[in-house]
Amino acid sequence: MGKNFKVEGVLPSVCVVYKDKSCRELDEEAYRELLRYLLQTDISALVVGGHAGEAECLSMEERLRVIKIAKEEAKGKVPVLGGIIADATWMAIEQGKIQRDAGADAFLFCPPTIIAWDPNTAENLLIEHVKRFDKQVKMPFIMFGGPTSEGSYQILPKTLKRLAIEAENLVGWKITTRYDLGAFRGCLRALREAEKQTGKQIGVLNAGDHILVETIREGGDGTLNGGSIYRAAEDVEIYKAVKKGDIVKAYAIQDKLRPITDAIRGVLYGYSHTYFHYRYKVAAWLLGKIPRPYMRLPMLPVSKEEVEVMRDALIKSGMKPVREAQAIEVSDM
């Protein structure tokens, strides 16, 4: 696939499903059913190695298994992306080679946590980390991070540009900017400048679902986020509408989804990145797309009150929950 992997459209970061609240065993059939739903919606790729997929909480054997299942379900229709989540460079390289050999078509690359100590002065650390991975693994990857992120994902536009130029197989960037459209513009500008210098295409993706219309109108290429596990059809519809120039339709869909978007982003009860992935799973569970919403520890479930808020928000957004709100038990694992 190499440099021909064009990063655009809707790329869901797919959650895993467990057989019960112990979270000790993957529910492979339920996972396949979720993938089949997503593949019916004209998505552009399946990202199975991201944080929304709890990659950092899975064994390597489990990570390879979800890649294999995704490849079986995708049947070549869309690429399957594994994930690189490692603090040591040698570990990142090893993860890449193992997943590559298992069939991953590309990767979502998460920065090491050491970058969080000082993103301004740690630029060379990140670039060396990524470049060594790039040269050893020789596979396309999408980088993750942005200027308004927290912790290790805070990456400045000048670093985005430099990495995009120096890492040959970097083909896309998942930009995290919260609600800051100006920050997205800065990243987009930096990456487009890198495109001109290198002659390669770099897909610029919004990390969230709250300003999807705005970021695509600005020149972005789509979205990569865990929210698409419950709203992939709507996200694809928004993307296509903007690309066709039907901005009225795109905003109508985005505005209709505002209640559940706000509920998941914690607008009603306190913004918190920590619970985004659990809320994505709860939304998918309420809508019947997965049979259970459990996540492995240290993640704790959202409260019953939050589940009630989310169910109400789904209804207000024109969606049809098939389950009642209830308390979610804490995982055993």
Predicted region positions:
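A general structural signal for well-ordered alpha-helical segments in protein cores
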Residues: 31, 67, 92, 184, ...
